Curated annotation (Swiss-Prot):
Keywords: Cytoplasm, Exonuclease, Hydrolase, Nuclease
Coiled coil spans: none
InterPro entries, sorted: Exonuc_VII_L, Exonuc_VII_lsu_C, OB-fold_nuc-bd_dom
Organism of this sequence: Lactococcus lactis subsp. cremoris (strain MG1363)
Catalytic activity: Exonucleolytic cleavage in either 5'- to 3'- or 3'- to 5'-direction to yield nucleoside 5'-phosphates
EC main group: hydrolase
Gene it is expressed from: xseA
Protein name in the entry: Exodeoxyribonuclease 7 large subunit
Amino acid sequence: MTEYLSVSTLTKYLKAKFERDPYLERVYLTGEISNFRRRPNHQYFALKDEGAVIQATMWAGQFRKLDFELEEGMKVLAIGRISIYPPSGSYSINIESLVPDGVGALALKFEQLKKKLAAEGLFDQRWKQNLPQFSKKIAVVTSPSGAVIRDIITTVQRRFPMSQIVLYPTKVQGAGAAEEISGNIRRANERGDFDVMIIGRGGGSIEDLWGFNEEIVVRAIFESRIPIISSVGHETDVTLADFVADSRAATPTAAAELATPNTKIDLINWANEQESRLFNRLTHLIKIRRERLEKLSQSVVFRQPERLYDGHVQKLDRLCERLTVLTENKVANMKHRYELSANRLIPTYSKIVESKKNKTEQLYQSLLLLDISKIKARGFSLITDENGKIIKSVSDVKKGQALDVELTDGQVKVEVK
């Protein structure tokens, strides 16, 4: 009897076959990107050629490793694993690696970034700054070792020795190079006293020169207020730094020549030009001052100098009158306040004196009451023993004891019975 399989059973069987097949565990495909729309995380698109289409999935972690931007219609080389999706019965490739077909990833990234920045206008001629004819201070962003800095120093000293060179030691290739290049460009701008800046390095592969193609470097050059001369690689090497820089030189020597005057004749012409500008400026200033002097000489003040002081004299008189009035008002006000204070203080002072007088009289009378002679005059006597001790109680004496009794008109001796 014929046994019929369910669709699910068949799909599971095929899925197991696919997963166990060593040829399908790692497949190398070439094709054209189709139906690509960038998503926040995982990417879903198709690979096609003239005869077939296969769905493709690329997980977020793998997609972030790409050195170029995927585009619709781009030819690529893909490495991945074939799998079946049971609900739809369709097969697809899970891509692990993806590179452009026929062009290097860096070359493609170069063209994509160049297109993006050009669309923003970063390479437009209208943004280019003119190089100064005579640079007193030159910033150099390059490696501290190697022929580049030596060639620049030699050329500047030969052509315009009065120029000062300030080197910003910079890593020019490898990891972190772009960050150092852009950082030193910004640091030179923060200093603010450079006439021109040279950035560059010697020749090398596209990988060696790539630091000068990074977006952060291009934007740092674009934002620089200092005119920048780019000298990266050999004459045949082209970087994005060359497109955005204010000027490009094929060699470090050529860059130094752009930053300095050509010959002694240029220096003489420049000196003559400065002399002419100074003469014209002084002539113009003298003319303005002469016209102003002539205008002033026709004024009333110069024809009648005494009138120059009329206004000041009148103002001084008004100020003196005002000062006199203010002084009189101030004195009158103080006199009035004094009189008010005196009227309040005199009655108060009289009351205080009278009160103190009464209290003194009371104290005096109290003291009189305590006078011993007054007490004896009222019939009281003072009794003391033989030692002069005052007798205050019966318990202070004993029988037969001799006592002194002091009266108002004399003293008598008595004996206790």
